Every structure is written in C-alpha cells, then in structure tokens.
Amino acid sequence: MYDIEELEVGMSASYSQTITDADIKQFAGISGDRNPVHLDEEYASQSRYGKRIAHGMNSASFFSALFGTKLPGKGCVYVSQSLKFRMPVYIN
C-alpha cells in the first residue's frame, strides 16, 4: 500500500480472481441482473458467446479491490471509470 504522495506515473499493481458459478449467482442476486446469458446454460449456448458469461460489472468491480488494497491501498475510493467490454469473461 502507498500514501497518495508516494504514487508515481508508471507504477502498477495487479489483481486476479477466478469467477465461479457461485460468484455469478451471487452477483445476479445482489445486482438484480438475472439475464439468462449469465445464469442459463441452454440459453447462453445459443448466444453469441456460446456459453454462460460473467456480468461485465462484476469484472469491473475488481477495480475497487485493486485500488482499495494494492495501489494506492487502504482508504482509496475511486469515483469514476469508463469501460469498454471487449471480451467476455467465462466461468472459471
């Protein structure tokens, strides 16, 4: 973790997490987004993705984990982001 004064251009940090079936179901419950492309294997198999995918905002929420625990770390709250989802995130 870093204090804001310690941040420099070019610093980096990483965060990795495997999204499981349980994560998908929990995120659907929390967000209210029960789109069958996330929850229904048969429906998703007929979609452009070919199988179930994670919610885009579930993946985007990992920015909060990265900023709040790694760079800069404790106490950091980010207030804006702009996203373009280029590739689906599949389960596991």
Question: Model segments located where?
Answer:
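Hot-dog-fold acyl-thioester-processing enzymes
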Residues: M1-S80
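Active-site beta-strand->loop segment that positions catalytic residues and contacts the acyl thioester
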Residues: S80-N92
